[in-house]
Amino acid sequence: MQTSFDHLADRILAGGDATPADALAVLRADEKDLLHVVAAAGRLRRARFGNTVKVNYLVNLKSGLCPEDCHYCSQALGSRAPILKYNWLSSEEVLEQAGAGLRGGATRVCLVSSGRGPSDRDVDRVAAMAQELKGEQPGVEICACLGLLKDGQAERLRAAGVDAYNHNINTAESHHDTIVSTHSYSDRVDTIEKAAAAGLSPCSGLIAGLGETDEQLVEALFALKALGADSIPVNFLMPFDGTPSERTFELTPIRCVQILAMTRFVCPDTEIRIAGGREMHLRSLQALALHVANSIFLGDYLTSEGQDARADLEMLRDNGFAILGAEAKPAGTATAAHRAQTAHDIAGGTSVAGSAPDPAIRRRGAGTDVPANA
């Protein structure tokens, strides 16, 4: 017997669009209907992406000391979270960190820096890093995430070989001013539009669990669709101690899967990435969520530790997913290296699915002398 979610998938596969009412229905589906929701959304995922999963790797080029006051962010002005703080990594350090992620199975490297936005000198610095990385790894995709862009900066990044630019809208316009006061929603939209106009693939997503309503989640998602985001990272709030969002837990694993499924129904042909908070909030439903989403980050995040990279790859393999681009990697890399379990078990430092809900502060990889979780 077909469910209403099957009928919605049929309509979308026939060329129709999900409406805001459809999105709300998915978001508010009864928990007992979760597998029906996933099965229907999964049809859309497989129609566009098959069983592949894109693996991305973050390199935090500059950590902490940001002048913006985003309430959710451990790097923001006023945050007391005990995160790693450091200035720009050298090109050598960036190549080392990116190489670890690529050897671990990633095909896209995301070069991220804290701050309101880059100076022209910062753009030159990142452009040089991108050129060096492309020289060493010609097939790598590079996404830059440097904050609000000024006129002409996106074009310079594109000319240097950067493929994509990430700048999340984070939440609905109607909710934006409750989470940050130092920049506006329109500032964020302007940067996404600048990136797209320069030929950079626009990557923009949201953070769930910021006190938004169901309607505001839907509002944010349709805004991302209207902006033409090629990739939508869906983050789940990590409530760091020392931030205004500390001790804020509004999400359940089922709720997170419903949010991802809603995103798939509204944006059936878009890369949907399970981003920050995956391990903390999805817990044992991580693999189920990948039947709806088709992209993850490998290993650690900007300031928090993620699941052990070996566990990420084992999860993909055990559930029959194929890592996008893995067929192009030479023998002995990616999953083979992880099966051998050769690297970096850090005692007490690795987050696993189902662990305690407090974010584990990143103490390895970029900005440290400890090997990366990749």
Curated annotation (Swiss-Prot):
SMART domains in the cross-refs: BATS, Elp3
Cofactor: [4Fe-4S] cluster; [2Fe-2S] cluster
Binding site for [4Fe-4S] cluster: 66, 70, 73
Gene3D superfamilies documented for this protein: Aldolase class I
NCBIfam families: bioB
Family of this protein: Belongs to the radical SAM superfamily. Biotin synthase family.
Protein known as: Biotin synthase
Organism of derivation: Nocardioides sp. (strain ATCC BAA-499 / JS614)
